[in-house]
Amino acid sequence: ARRAGAVTNFGFIDPPDMKAVSDGFNELTELKAIGRKRGEVTLTHTGRQLARIPIDVRLGRMVIEAAKTGSPNLLAQVLVVVAFLSLQDPRERPDDKREDADRIHNRYADETSDFLTALNIWDRVFQADGDPSNNALRRICKTEYFSWLRMRQWKDLVSQLRQMCKELKFKVGDPLPASRPGLEIRQLPLNQQAAHSLCCAWDADGIHKSMLAGLLSMMGMQVVREPKASDFAGLTGSARARAMKRAQKQSKNDYQGARGTRFALFPASAVAKKTPSWVMSTELVETSRLWARYSAADPAWAEPLAGQLTRTTYAEPHWSGSRGSAVATARVLLYGLPIVQDRAVQWGRINPLEARDFLIRQGLVEGDIQQRFSYDDFVGKNRDILEDAADDASRTRQLADTVSDEDLFDFYNAVIPNDVTSVADLAKWWKSEHDRQPNLLDFDPAKVERLASSDSVSLDDYPDHWHTTGSDGQPIDLRLSYVYDPADPADGVTVHVPLKALSRITPDQFTWNVPGLLDELILSMIKALPKQ
């Protein structure tokens, strides 16, 4: 039925467990097999394709992804792996020959992926030396510790899947590796063939990317907890050393899975020796621990495959002068796992109002813009006005009567459009607006409304130099500087006396003050008078 949601209202004689139904819907949503249209759950195009593939839906999703994004040969390789995962493992380990079987099987083991290990086996048995007859296959299986029946089932299922893909109009090539071990290695006696010696070169990225489409909720992130010495307080000697070594090894084989699950890589997996930072697996088996089988290193391609299954959080929005825009750090979560961390994103796409505020306050008012654009001289001119105003405030000690950063911010905020959130946006808008109003962004302190009613202060009362006469009767010109900061030892007016003029002046010449500060001088002298 295309209206998949009808199952919840169907009159079953023996109704299924609703949790199982809910889990099924969640799985189909993850695989993009169902969607919502006008409030109803419906089958998607992918869902209708999955319905025609007679294998587990997760494995079917891998086939569809390979057909959609990969080459015909890649699809053929994925079909081999999917068929392998659909059946019982053909590798055998007789109780009396386990070590020998493990050594034989390790020749095929790929340390990065159990999926590629399956392809190595397929290539060696069915391709490298031609398609074997039944008798030849029996001899190979006996020597290689494979089950002849399962190998036949594997081959038959691959043939069936290839035919099914053709019916779905998928182009299927041949599962050939880019390269394989030479004949001289394959013809060596088995006891002379080293571990991993039969590994081929496959399109590992393409294979794993296709398979990840069906395993989004089967990923895991390594969580390393270094053992502490206090964990072994009750042990001594060699027992303590062995326990610490075992704990050290186990600490790296601990993974956080989807929705808070924890698991470890199955010890027999070749990947378990590498303990990669990220893995994906086709099944979880619970014994003494929750083990992951057939795990492979995650290539971190989950985000485009997951789509709406992800949740993105943002932190630390700030202005970036080098980028000319506000940026933030993005973290993308899939079933609680951070598949993307510390990605810089344009804050204007997330919060345009706040991004515009960053542009005006830190980019324009504070002048933190590293890019040049047409007619951008207003930025420096307006900054010069603020710096002059700050110097005037240091002289007059009247902060409220001079323009401030907030005044310039209010000016820009009133004239710059709301959709301008970056230097690039500003440059584009200003280039077209400049011809109509070339002085629009020129800041005029005289138009600041809050200063219109304030009493004007003459800067002539705060001169830059003091002219006096030296003890030798010659004129002396001394520079003056102003600081308005009660916590600064230089607060007030400072006379800069050159060393060569020091002997020509006397302390009595410094009982004066500049006209603008006479009121404060008189007030401080009155306060210094004795109370009685």
Predicted features by range, described:
Residues 1-323, 353, 357, 383, ...:
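Second RecA-like catalytic domain
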Residues 164, 174-254, 268, 304-532:
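A positional "C-terminalness" feature that preferentially activates on distal terminal regions of long
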